[in-house]
Amino acid sequence: MRTSRVIASLIRSLMLGSAAPATAAVMLTTLVGCKDESQPEYWVDKLSEPSWRGRAVVRLQQFFEDALTKANKDMKAPEVQDLINKSVEPLTNLYKDSYSDLDTKTRVGLIKLLADFRDKRTEPALKKAFEEFAKSPRTSKDDADIKWAARANQELKLDSLADPMLQAFLKMKTSTMLGGIVYRDLNEAMVAVSAKSWAGPLSGVLEKPMTPPTSKDKEVADDYRDQLFWQTTAAEVLGRIGDPSAVPALTKVMVDPGKADVQTTALLALVKLGKPAADAATKLLKGEDTALIDFYKSRVKELSGAEPKNSPHVATAALILGTIGRADALPALISALQSEKDDGNKAVIARELSKIPATPESVAAFKSVYESLSPDAEIPPGGKALDQLTEAAGAFRDPGMIDWLLTQAANAKGDADDRKALQAAIALTVLKLAKPSQMAQAKEAINKYGTDVEKALYAQAEAVVKECGEKADCYVNALQKSDYQDQKNQFAGIKAGYMVAILGNEGTRDQLIAGLDKVTNASLRYVAAQAIDKLTPKGSKEVSAKLNDIVQKNAKSADRDKAAGDAPLKQVMYRLDGRTG
């Protein structure tokens, strides 16, 4: 505006005669209609002048931020879209055509602005960012072009960017300064896009060896970090893609002792894949996949220098089958128990039986293993087997097991401390499972075997049982009570969650899902997820979709605890999907 005033003043000083006022008015009106620094069009024009480009990009970013603020962050607001429409193509062309000529600060600021537009017309620039990085990987944190390109494509999901983004991903090293600030954005974008064309290349990524660092050798540590990023992301994306061709690579990760840090993600991917993954695990359990078993043995020897003992691949196969949770896995697991001699493997198989919709045969098999184990028996990767199986007994959500559990407590062996700890744990499992008519048995067990801690928990459980009796919907409401979200009162909510699973039905499950936002305590959210799983034994795409809506909503929340608390919901969601195929 200052420039316009100066020019207008100069014109007036040159005007002569009585016609001056009228002529000046006409010319001034014309000048006001011209572009000036207060208008985005002025700066769009300046993009063509190399010496002005840096300042022009900064000013256009300011225009965009101001427009977005005035529109209350509404990207669809007319004033925001008007600015984008005026600038998106010139900015895109500048990045695409002048990439090599721009200084780093201007170039990165430009791609950030284009990414903020979330506009499909920026595709040539986003593609350029990915391709240039893949061609010549950068390491400086100042060269963060692909950070912004990844954020944009996370929402845009453009088919034409699938391969360029994949190639950039394959070149990104988290061990670099740039990798440290970009890896999360690239991971989230890869997961969001999950292009079907990636199944082959990402399965290949999982074939790369990983050697956990055992020294301070920076090169070895950096290589491990890079592989961890690539392979964890690859496993997660392969699960989302859902292509059965990924099952062999994911299963191979599960038996590779060098990839322990990738295995949790690979396991969830196998759960998503459902039946094809369960079929592969069954083959491994039966010892029929000799190539995979030989690979496992060679990796154990390579990393430890010793031959593996007791066929640990059996435990891995059982873990996969139990986590997937398909009822058709039960015959193979029960059959494996009949021939298995190793206590550790037997304990793992029994634990995994408790994760699958129960049958009389599976409950009997679980009890048989429990009764056969000595107090000193351990379960891989470590810990007392009976301790874990006592907790697992509760996963059946079967009050009919209470008399049997109390018999195990009475017959418990071992040294005094171990025996007392096991008996207290059994009493607590009994308390969780007890229906109103069984609370007297639970109280007797708690008084006999429990400490003051267990006795205090009994009081919480008793209160909620007295309130709700046999009414499943009452327990749903109790699970959602704000008082029970407090850690000191959470056992009342845990008891309520067990009773929802024991007394409820599909209607109860739907009521629970509808009120999950009220369940903020992580332990209660876990119990709620288990109740949903228990009440959906045949799986359900509809229920899975409802859980996914909750997970996606919380993932966008500024409260990171909300997203973290949804881990059990995710696993149940995948299990419900895996049971339907």
Q: For each of these PLM feature ranges, what is it?
A:
Residues 18-21, 25-26, 474, 495, ...:
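Low-complexity, intrinsically disordered short segments enriched for Gly/Pro and polybasic residues
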Residues 2-32:
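Sec-dependent bacterial lipoprotein signal peptides
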Residues 53-81, 100-120, 139-158, 176-196, ...:
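Structural detector for internal amphipathic alpha-helices that build alpha-solenoid repeat scaffolds
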Residues 11, 32-36, 47-49, 575-579:
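Extended amphipathic alpha-helical repeat scaffolds
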Residues 34-45, 66-98, 119-136, 158-173, ...:
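Amphipathic alpha-helical scaffolding segments comprising HEAT/armadillo-like alpha-solenoid repeats
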